[in-house]
Amino acid sequence: LFETYIESENWDLANKLWTEIEPQAQNDVKLLSGYLLVNKKLENNAGCDKLAQQIIKLDASNITALEWYAEKYYWKAENLYLSEMKAYKAKRTNSQYSRLLKALEQVYPDFRKSRDYYLKLYKIDPKKEYANYLGNIFTRLDDKEKAEYYYKKAK
């Protein structure tokens, strides 16, 4: 029934049913992956982090959990990068430049984390979507050669 709710995109019903599933079944990677998807759709990010961590302990190559982390770190880095660059371009002062540099200290490690997850995903399944993300990440990390390589793979 839980899987049926997921397939039919009844996220709230799937979420309610989860508590009724036997504890042993709650350690099944397939069910946990489904529950991660439910939490993602319901925008329960803290729950997603906990579930993804639990799934990766059981299956280090689980696509759903790896995608969660890859996207999480990518968008965290990208959104901060864009907002700080926009602020700096609007007001090119020493203080704004210092703020940009401080933000980049957070941005680059998150891009690297995302890169590592996307590289693993790409190795498992060389999707164009993963290659495009890798191209974007390598562009931000100023590695033009690798960015170009992955952009070509994305076409």
Segments the model singles out, each with a brief description of its role:
Residues 78-117:
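Short coil/linker segments at helix-helix boundaries
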